[in-house]
C-alpha cells in the first residue's frame, strides 16, 4: 500500500479482478462487513484506491493475460517464483499444512509487485536489505 494525501492505496497484480473481490466475498461469507476502503461497488474505476500492475500493463488490451512472473521478466525485475507458484498454494495448504511457505511466497510477490511499480515510475528497485518483513 502507498499513501496519497493521507489515503491508502492498495497495490497488487490483478488486485482489482482477484484479490479485492476474493477478500470481499470471504468477508460476506463470514458475515463480516466490507470496510469502506474496499467497497468499490458504486465507484468509477478511476476513483478506486488501487494500483494494479496487471491493469496498467494491459494499456487497454483485454485479449491477453500477463502473469506477475512474465511481467517481472519483461521489466527486468527478479522473479519471486523460486519455490512455489499460485497453482501450488492449495496443495501446500491442504496437504503440507505449511502456512509459512505460503506466507514467504506471498511476501516475495509483494516485493516483486512493488519493484514493478518502481520500474513503471523509472525508479530504482528495492535492494534486499531495504525490505523489512513484519511478522
Question: For the regions a protein language model found, what residue spans apply to each?
Answer:
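Metal-dependent phosphoesterase core characteristic of DEDDh/y 3'-5' exonuclease domains
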Residues: 4-103, 116-121, 125-130
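C-terminal accessory domains and tails appended to enzymatic cores
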Residues: 132-135
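Noncatalytic, basic helical substrate-engagement surface that gates or grips nucleic-acid strands
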Residues: 1
